[in-house]
Amino acid sequence: MGIKDWPEGEGPRDKLLQKGAGQLSDAELLAVLLRNGLAGLNAVDLARSLISEFGGLRNLLCAPRNQVCRLPGVGPVKYAQLQAAAELARRVAQENLQRGQVLTNPDLTRDYLMRQLADRSYEVFAVLLLDSQHRVIQFVELFRGTIDSASVYPREVVSLVLEKKAAAVIVCHNHPSGIAEPSQADRRITERLKNALATIDVSLLDHMVVGDREIVSFAERGWIN
């Protein structure tokens, strides 16, 4: 049965308007974005099948286009709608950490970095630039791909810091595997960056590794002195 044939108020769009988006299941929210299903499968059923196929919303939203569009009922238009929704969520998070904001709340930083990096299917190394009062200057993605001690260049980080006149930085990167535990390569990168930044009297406050559901802080583990 198509959603249009459901009793009034029971469809996901009606339910959202009457009760609020927070009352919808993952499949119902996804169905609102998909708008319609395909022959023999309404939008909610299609949404459930997609969530099941990819093992969750996060995996679905960060899956490559060719993997999503190969499935029945999902073409370029629906893929674009899903990507637009994911990008809007990231931009909302970015607005929550605006230029000039003082970083006094570690949870705000964690939430921001989680939203920016947790859903990436590839590794990203980024720098959060701060002034002498620990106010945000800018968040910059510097490197993409396999992040190891050979692919992160301290001189590029130093060059960016000098260009933006930052006084302190927090570096971060994600693990697409979802496991946030830092590797030995991560620790080597951190030591090289700390030493390079020290030559220009800039503090490395932390290196945060973003996983699927957690963030590991080098500072909290006592790995940055």
From Swiss-Prot:
| Domain MPN, first and last residues per copy | 102-224
The taxonomy runs: Bacteria, Pseudomonadati, Pseudomonadota, Gammaproteobacteria, Alteromonadales
**What protein is this chain from?**
UPF0758 protein Sbal_0377
Task: Fetch the PROSITE patterns from UniProt.
Answer: MPN, UPF0758
Q: Name one GO biological process term.
A: proteolysis
Output the superkingdom of the source species: Bacteria
Q: Where is this motif: JAMM motif?
A: 173-186
Keyword line: Hydrolase, Metal-binding, Metalloprotease, Protease, Zinc
- Report the Gene3D superfamilies cross-referenced here: Cytidine Deaminase, domain 2
* Family, similarity comment: Belongs to the UPF0758 family.
